[in-house]
Swiss-Prot record:
<dbReference type="InterPro" id="IPR035439">
    <property type="entry name" value="UPF0145_dom_sf"/>
</dbReference>
<comment type="similarity">
    <text>Belongs to the UPF0145 family.</text>
</comment>
<protein>
    <recommendedName>
        <fullName>UPF0145 protein TTHA1256</fullName>
    </recommendedName>
</protein>
<dbReference type="Pfam" id="PF01906">
    <property type="entry name" value="YbjQ_1"/>
</dbReference>
<dbReference type="InterPro" id="IPR002765">
    <property type="entry name" value="UPF0145_YbjQ-like"/>
</dbReference>
Length: 107
């Protein structure tokens, strides 16, 4: 499955547009990890735990979007966009949404 942020695929012709597809992932924050991240914010440095969670959420959202496209018979998803939103009381959750247009490519 080809996933691209562009609206065309170089060297390939889009035969049919199948519809908009989405994938979402919501991850909750861990209290201990939050505390360690706050300490890192004060002393500087990157939060590896948060980066890993963000990467996992992004990969999950993209995989769900690709699966939705497969169910429509798509060969690719063009115009892929990723959105990030903080949710929950105390902003304790992160939602990652992937969206794009499922397409069938000409042979």
């Amino acid at each position: 499955m080809i996933l691209t942020t562009t609206h065309e695929i170089e060297g390939r012709r889009i035969e049919r547009y199948l519809g908009i597809v989405f994938g979402e992932a919501i991850v909750g924050a861990n209290v201990l990890r939050d505390l360690l991240a706050q300490i890192r914010d004060i002393v500087g440095g990157r939060s590896g735990a948060y980066e890993a969670e963000l990467r996992r959420a992004r990969e999950t959202a993209l995989a769900e979007m690709a699966e939705a496209a497969r169910r429509l018979g798509a060969d690719a998803v063009v115009g892929v966009d990723l959105d990030y939103e903080v949710l929950g009381s105390g902003n304790s959750m992160l939602m990652v949404t992937a969206s794009g247009t499922a397409v069938k490519l000409a042979p």
